[in-house]
Amino acid sequence: MTSLVEGTLVVVSAHSADFVWRAGGAIAAHTAQGGRAHVICLSYGERGESAKLWRSPGMTLEAVKAARQEEATHAAEALGAEVSFFDAGDYPLPPAEQLVERLASELRVLAPGAILTHAAYDPYNTDHSDAYRITLQGRMVAQAHGFQPEDGAVLGAPPVFVFEPHQPEVCEFRPDLLLDITEVFPQKRKAMECMAAQEHLWRYYTDLAERRGVQAVRNSGNKAIVHAEAYQRVFPTVASGLS
């Protein structure tokens, strides 16, 4: 199994659990080979993705946020990743201009070798679409010589991959990379089980990894693959050969 990228893998997640379901395998594969992975959660998903917690008597917004932060922190640890929280609020995320420069500053510091984030179009959850735009704008601003010129750390051109949305057919998602996560799927499953507020998704994303694994075998001939994750490139890949 090969990791996705050389250098730091940065994952921009709209809510505190998104990175687990959709990119947990890539994160674990990268860190298993000694790579660094850093997850940026724009929000905790406290309003829109924590229904189970809100059913508890006397629950408050701050208590939900604390629970979601604890879950995501444990999940990141299971994947071998660092995690930071912008606490921007969700449903909806705030306007992009409130987050873009903060993200750009983080990208300058992290100097990612690749970035993973949401698909461009998700009519079911526009926070995901907004996270995509915030990510691309943050990358663009971090590349600008006139942004914080005093730090002298202009970002290069890290590739961006979008991970699979919950309803790919409706979100115009067309995978062009199937990543073998067979060896690290136990870590992904452990991370999923940290997200107790969304226990109903554990089985769904286990099944999805198996289905993508079948497709990976079909597309590679490698019958050892059992689990995979699907990604779509945003920018062309630059290579010296066809493979």
What are these regions (language model features)?
Residues 1-12, 33, 82, 93-243:
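Metal-dependent de-N-acetylase/amidase catalytic core
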Residues 1-110, 240-241:
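Active-site rim/loop-helix segments in enzyme catalytic domains that contact anionic ligands
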